[in-house]
Amino acid sequence: MSNFMDRLSVSYAKGIIRWRWLVLLVTILATLGVASGGRFLSFTSDYRVFFGDDNPQLNAFESLQDIYTKTDNILFVLKPNNGKIFTPQWLEVVQDLTEESWQIPYSIRVDSITNFQHTEAVEDDLTVADLVEETGGLSQAGLDRIEQIALSEPALAKRIISEDSTTTGVQITLQLPPDDAIALDEAVKFAENMAATIEATNPELEVAITGLAPLSNAFPAASMADMSTLTPLMFLVIIIFLIAFLRSFTGTLGTLLVTIFSTMVAMGAAGYAGIKMTPPSAMAPTIILTIAIADCVHILVTMFHEMRHGKAKRDAIVESLRVNMQPVFLTSLTTVIGFLSLNFSEAPPFHDLGNIAAIGVIAAWIISIAFLPAFIAVMPVRVKPVETGKSSMMERLGEFVIGHRTKLLLGMGLIVVGTSSFISRIELDDRFIEYFDTTVPFRVDSDFTRDNLTGVYQVEFSINAEESGGVSSPVYLAHLEDFANWLRAKPEVVHVNSITDILKRLNKSMHGDDDSWYKLPDERDLAAQYLLLYEMSLPYGLDLNSQINIDKSASRMTVTLDNVSSNDMRDIALESSQWLQDNAPGYMGADGSGAAVMFAHLADRNIKSMLSGTALAFVLISLSLVFALRSLKLGLISLIPNMVPAIMAFGVWGLFVGQVGLAVSVIAATSLGLIVDATVHFLSKYNRARTERGESSADAVRYGFRTVGSALWITTAVLVAGFAILSLSTFAVNADMGLLTAITIAIALFIDFLLLPPLLMLFDREKATATSTAPAAPAE
Amino acid sequence: MSKKLLSTVFSLSLVAFTSGTVLSSAALADEAADIAKGTEIAEEWDRRDWGFGDTESYMEMQLENRHGDKSIREMRQKTLEVPGHDVGDKSLTIFDKPRDVKGTAFLSFAKIFDPDDQWMYLPAVKRVKRISSKNKSGPFLGSEFAYEDLSAQELKKYTYKWLRDEPCGELQCAVVEQTPTYENSGYTKMITWYDLSEYRQQKIDYYDRKGKLLKTLVSSDFKQHLDKYWRPYNMYMENHQTGKKTRLVFSKIEFQKGLKDSELTKNTLKRVR
């Protein structure tokens, strides 16, 4: 069987060399053909892409947005260098900004302190007017009055105006076409230009921009930044590595071409498939570049080794393919399985990442066993006849491992257990603002907003009344008020927006602005008529639909939270639902929703969905190892070095970092496919030594170190470097994933060199038979 | 020789100059003609509605959000024509449904350039409140109609410009661009389709403050009263930006019931049923 595969590989290799020009032509043309799909690639700009169509939090939020005015928004935050915002100068800026904001594309509503509809009673007249009308002639008394009204108005304080009066916001509600990156960018760019203009004309004013629209717009920016900075950086690192390790121009060039072609094929296929790039899938090019190298390195290292030992180039190519065909295929297969398992993820961007990377890996496999040998065959290759020190160093390492196998087994066991115990310190946290690092303007502005004005995370409730028009019912309003007060008492809650505040204010205004009437109306008809009156007096762009549904059978409560962890967000949402269930009539039951809540559940849901995906990948990968090595025993032994690295990596993360979000859920599956590679190469050499050469397990370990040791160093170094580069991403999910994967791969090599050989020598002790019928159905 | 050349150049440039002036003044004349034509059409529309006296209409307002949820309100409206071009009409709106606002009455004296005078009677407190608000461009009762869409369309509220004639359904329409002349309008312009047989406003496109198409009003089921006055019994307003829709369906419109000015005052508001 093994001989048959070898013979097949040999005739395949000879065929490639014979038809080398044709192979080159076909692979290049095929690559270009698929790569042309790249012109269809586009970037998505909707934070909702992180949620599958059947995500319950997404659906809750979508149905809330169907009932009320949409929540896509832009929030301008203005803060003078010193002093209060309540001066004629600054109020005029706010007023102008409020007016100009109507020019922002897709704006449908603008809210600020100046256009806040203040109601005031003068005898039998009820004045409903902008809180700030004329800024020019405002006296100090007038300014004080406006300040006092704004600060005592629950709808404004800590939402649109800060408690210390130094910071204010102008809130723009947008009605954007769904997932239209151009429309979104147009609106956000317009707002950014406005902010820049205001800052230019008012140097002592700081203007920040946050909101869900800038959040959405930050995603394509992050994707493009990753693709335009990290991918080239990866190229540079690859070139340095290849030159340093291969010391061959042709080898370096050939490998580079393989990696580029593989990436082009993958991205082209993604384009044809209509995949829209998101920050996670924007990692794909870097990942493919990294992985594609491994195949080439294994083929080239063997080839150069043979040439150094006197073989002619073409013979060396044939020998290299004979030895590497199987492991290269196997490592590609396991990597593909690992990436495809991402399709189990809750978050669709990871499906895209997995599928694009899988295509890239398959392309890399085909190109490195077809294009690469043909390319080497036509290009000049020179090797120094002298062997470098690497190999002997690896041999010394091998001797060390063989000599200290028992100590290593115990020591490594302790390290594994010790490191893994820190997993408990890992905390899941997905604050979407912190997905972006502090070099991203959106993050800086959002932090500024949180520090100076209001929270950036919101939980929304749509609370039903008993019937149509029921929002006016005193029972409903009383419970709504209790709920709002209960929320306001929580330290994490910055602001609560509720219709009860409107009704209390109207009641007061209808009673000559008497403070003792600042309470809820106690009759349904009265409340309904107040609402009608208020509704009839609102100006352009303001209506009650942002807070009350059209048949007045439900109202919306928006709770703004401080910078709390996503755990706390989930808890608040849960406690709130529980409070409503315990304290309000059954029909008022509601679950919190909103972008913050969606992201707060994402990592959790994703881990659960990835558990089965990871398990399946693990089973499939282990089965392919058993099948390929034709040994159940080796397959079983391989479980340990395949499973342990990810666990240890989480432990290391728990020890040094602690917090992790969405990234954690996909690491086990994707890194599995990669770390298995080292195990596969080592085991396949070990197995070859045992079965072909009939060596003892210690000698087979020696053979393994000698033949693949340095190739494993190189490929691991490249993989670690590649994923470490991803950790430079400005997008936390990518950075975490890159760093965690890099740690996992580094640990995997450590385990493969120091733990796997002692395990082999412990469990695979019996004398090997030199026949090809290795234990296919082991007796154990 | 050089003199001749000079004079040739001079006369050539003169020709060029005058023809340029002629061209631009022709364009100006066209523009003026279009404005005149547009204004004429609007005047004809206005003239045909003169002397209706007073009306009493019964209507149902159907609100629909983009999700398809619906809500219905019922009301009556009494309108009194105030002669002259400089003042608007007076109107009284009485709400019948939903039940919790039944009997609430809204009195409005339309003004052309200033905010309307408005009073509201709330039966739950049996009080009349004068409302001072710049809500002309605001939504009427949470619907897609703004006050300015529903309040009597006085001629002077807009400037007019004829754009083209084109078929509209089975009729032929003049398409006229109308630009609000009053402050605080929510629109930069409206495009109105007047049918050329009876000068009825068949359709209006409203453009928002950004100059983007905001909503479209389609009027239908026109009925003629007293052999003269046409009224649509169905007005359908669709907001293209939010996807929300409002349909106004009239069940009855009565003309010249003898409504008196003295019935439309703040003091009589309490007594309306």
Positions of predicted regions on the chain:
Chain B
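Gly/Pro-enriched, hydrophobic low-complexity segments
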Residues: 107-109, 117-121, 127-131, 136-153, ...
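N-terminal mature ectodomain segment of secretory-pathway/periplasmic proteins
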Residues: 33, 37-124
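Positively charged n-region of N-terminal signal peptides that target proteins for export
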Residues: 1-5
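C-terminal segment of classical bacterial N-terminal signal peptides
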Residues: 15-26
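Sec-dependent N-terminal signal peptides
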Residues: 8-14
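Short amphipathic beta-strand and strand-loop transition segments with alternating hydrophobic
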Residues: 76-83, 161-167, 220-223
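Surface-exposed beta-loop interaction hotspot
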Residues: 152-158, 165
